[in-house]
Amino acid sequence: INNGFIRNSHNVLTVSDRDIIHNNKSIKDISGRSTLQNKIIETFKNFKPDIIILGHADRVKKSTLEKMREINNSTKFSQWFLDPLSKHGPDHINNTNRILDKIDLLDSTFLTTDPSALSV
């Protein structure tokens, strides 16, 4: 996805929630998750994106997305998801919960599974 945006002359900033958490664990923030939320919000303020696309960003809290919406309500939020969501796929309950977790805060969702498999 990033490569497609870059090839179409868009400025892309990739943020890895896992890397930020891994590199920022401390006594004050044992899990690194608080630091992640703060870094995302500060980056959002500085970068001023037109769109945020989440891919397997399970560690990004809903409250962080809500704060970003408060800062700039015109930014579009989307997510993409490649893992299977059908009942017969591996770990379908967990995958379905992951895709639905932030769906009320998003403008769009891109799936590789037929959306009817979500039973929403």
Regions found by a protein language model. Name each.
Residues 1-120:
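Extended catalytic core of nucleotide-activated donor transferases of GT-like folds
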